[in-house]
Amino acid sequence: MSKTHLTEQKFSDFALHPKVVEALEKKGFHNCTPIQALALPLTLAGRDVAGQAQTGTGKTMAFLTSTFHYLLSHPAIADRKVNQPRALIMAPTRELAVQIHADAEPLAEATGLKLGLAYGGDGYDKQLKVLESGVDILIGTTGRLIDYAKQNHINLGAIQVVVLDEADRMYDLGFIKDIRWLFRRMPPANQRLNMLFSATLSYRVRELAFEQMNNAEYIEVEPEQKTGHRIKEELFYPSNEEKMRLLQTLIEEEWPDRAIIFANTKHRCEEIWGHLAADGHRVGLLTGDVAQKKRLRILDEFTRGDLDILVATDVAARGLHIPAVTHVFNYDLPDDCEDYVHRIGRTGRAGASGHSISLACEEYALNLPAIENYIGHSILVSKYNPDALMTDLPKPLRLTRARTGNGPRRTGAPRNRRRSG
């Protein structure tokens, strides 16, 4: 993490439980990010927090640090049963829940608090086995949490800490009724520490905070500009016929170390994957139709560097902590302006530079004015020479269950640059 993203405030300056400080410092966390410096004084004083912060600002460690400290500093509810977790962290997607769990593991190891994970699509019995042994902190998605609660595998009557991460995304995905169902089965708000984090503190998010929290303090960490000054943004206007060849040519030109390509539909993502896989790229596909075990494996391979390119729908644009992404390609301009910011926010993180390349084709160019108005600036337009685009490309692969990730290792060097001036 770059020092430019840190404050002078140290974790050791707070009255945090010694085991929490020890675990943080062991992982190299000494100074707070702005959101951590704002949140911790409030949560350590027992105040509820509703925070506005983008992914990558350190909000996950802010609420994890607060959660572990609170549980270590307060006794469990009397007569607590084995199926009663003490803290509940809700996330909108399986990937985000898994990531939060991974971030929490060093703290759990240092403190002895037990973690549980609950998400749909995979691992029902494996997750249940962990819950049956008793957990202190349960991290999960709302659907699976409700499933376990209805079958009495978990009981929320002993909850002392609640975290709602990516609250705006919860609304977007239609989970608000599930959230309210879960809250109704917990102790009253004034008997819990409540934390909510969201990329935007919209009216509906504030309404949720008012409804489910105890006089929450609002804190905001706004970037100087929504897209980040370390991200180079670039825009091309291809025809529909030239769009795929332009993407492949740009990939050969840029030769990204680690790139994410976003498209607006599952079908389009599969099409892009087929072309790139046929051309020998180490490319993975991440959409809602990919089985959960395979999704996690692909994310792990991409994070380790075994895959160079990830093709994804917006399911991967929120909450995933993938380090060192050098390039983001918007094959389709998103329909939602916020999704543009979330997509390109995968690169240029923690002080690193990044490159975002968007293709404004005939179908999605109409989304551009709203995006530029939202981010507050025009995106630099670059031209290309149609005659210099790659030709004689192999026939795209067809998607099968065995072909959603990995491929041959890249060899050689990128081809000569083909873009016109």
Curated annotation (Swiss-Prot):
Keywords, comma-separated and alphabetical: ATP-binding, Cytoplasm, Helicase, Hydrolase, Nucleotide-binding, RNA-binding
Residue ranges constituting the Helicase ATP-binding domain according to the UniProt record: 40-219
CDD domains to which the protein is assigned, alphabetical: DEADc, SF2_C_DEAD
Main location as per UniProt: cytoplasm
Comp. bias regions, Low complexity: 402-414
SUPFAM superfamilies: P-loop containing nucleoside triphosphate hydrolases (SSF52540)
Entries under PROSITE patterns matching the protein: DEAD_ATP_HELICASE (PS00039), HELICASE_ATP_BIND_1 (PS51192), HELICASE_CTER (PS51194), Q_MOTIF (PS51195)
Catalytic activity: ATP + H2O = ADP + phosphate + H(+)
Chain sites annotated for binding ATP: A53, Q54, T55, G56, T57, G58, K59, T60
Entry's Gene Ontology BP terms: RNA catabolic process
Motif stretch (Q motif): 9-37
EC number(s) given by UniProt: 3.6.4.13
Residue window of motif DEAD box: 165-168
Record region (Disordered): 395-421
Keyword set includes Signal: no
Domain of life according to the entry: Bacteria
Subcellular location: Cytoplasm
All copies of domain Helicase C-terminal, residue ranges: 245-390
SMART domains: DEXDc, HELICc
A GO cellular component entry from the record: cytosol
Function: DEAD-box RNA helicase involved in RNA degradation. Has RNA-dependent ATPase activity and unwinds double-stranded RNA.
Subunit note: Component of the RNA degradosome, which is a multiprotein complex involved in RNA processing and mRNA degradation.
Protein name: ATP-dependent RNA helicase RhlB
